[in-house]
Regions:
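Acidic donor-binding segment of Leloir-type glycosyltransferases
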Residues: 1-18
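Short aromatic/hydrophobic "clamp" motif used to bind/position activated sugar donors
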Residues: 38
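Glycine-rich, basic loop-to-helix element that forms the pyrophosphate-binding segment
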Residues: 16-33, 46
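Membrane-interface aromatic/basic loop that binds lipid-linked glycans or pyrophosphate carriers
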Residues: 196-197, 203-254
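Acidic helix N-cap motif at the loop->helix transition within catalytic regions
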Residues: 1-3, 46, 50
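The conserved acidic donor/metal-binding loop of glycosyltransferases
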Residues: 42-46, 69
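Conserved nucleotide-sugar donor-binding catalytic segment
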Residues: 91-178
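Conserved donor NDP-sugar-binding/catalytic core segment of glycosyltransferases
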Residues: 50-83
Length: 254
């Protein structure tokens, strides 16, 4: 790396004095970056050679960030091939997907995205409050998602490179595979909704998380519900949906 840095002044080599963990290390990287844009690339993943060029050409003043179609690849071949239907998704379309069912399969990891350096420095969250004793600074789960969520609020849409520009490697040593990270991400969503969104979004997420608890039949989300202070009032139509789900769950358990 030092050899490359000696050939091009734009390449910077930086080493922390101690091991500060992934999240604080990301923050140091963002602060040391001097370019207009940042492309994050984790050690397990790779990108197409022309990804940055194409992403920079696509981003505009109304775009929060640029992501591409991406593949998840294992030693046995392609695990998932995510292709997006449109070149642009509105802020509302993006938020409803990423916060709720995520039918479009928007990524949690920023490894397939191009961001403005200023946006990353202005919106990066280091500590995610929770009552489950989770420390996301140790793994970055939730901190990565909040990059997308916080930035998109300031723009009209996200932009999509409709080609396979990013590749995530899935293997048994992968941190995201070895660890159960779902609860970290749900706390990140709750933090974002409580801090940033209006009552409509806030109400919807409470209903959906309440439904998740019933449907999954476990108490993993208990502290989340306490945090949300669910008031047990719901529209009749949603109550009927939940009742139907409960009945189906009971039938399936017989």
């Amino acid at each position: 790396m030092n050899t490359w840095a000696s050939k091009d002044h734009r390449i910077k080599i930086y080493q922390n004095k101690t091991n500060i963990g992934p999240v604080l290390n990301w923050n140091e990287c963002f602060k040391h970056a001097s370019g207009e844009y940042i492309k994050i690339l984790w050690s397990d993943d790779w990108m197409a050679l022309d990804f940055i060029e194409r992403a920079v050409n696509l981003i505009d003043e109304k775009s929060a960030f640029v992501i591409s179609n991406h593949k998840i690849v294992s030693e046995n071949g392609i695990v998932d091939n995510v292709k997006y239907k449109k070149q642009k998704y509105t802020r509302k379309e993006y938020l409803y997907n990423i916060l709720f069912q995520n039918i479009e399969k928007f990524p949690l990891s920023p490894g397939c995205a191009l961001f403005r350096t200023k946006d990353l420095n202005d919106n990066f969250v280091i500590d995610i409050p929770n009552t489950d004793g989770l420390d996301s600074k140790k793994n970055g789960a939730g901190n990565d998602l909040l990059i997308f969520l916080n930035i998109v609020l300031n723009y009209a849409h996200i932009s999509i490179l409709q080609y396979d520009g990013s590749f995530f490697r899935a293997h048994k040593e992968s941190f995201s595979i070895q660890n159960q990270l779902e609860l970290y991400y749900e706390w990140a969503k709750v933090y974002f909704i409580q801090k940033k969104l209006n009552k409509t979004y806030y109400s919807n997420i409470k209903k959906i998380m309440f439904w998740q608890q019933i449907n999954k039949g476990n108490k993993i989300y208990h502290n989340l519900y306490v945090c949300l202070k669910y008031n047990y009032w719901m529209p009749l139509s949603f109550c009927i949906i939940i009742l139907g789900g409960v009945l189906n769950s009971l039938r399936n358990r017989k």
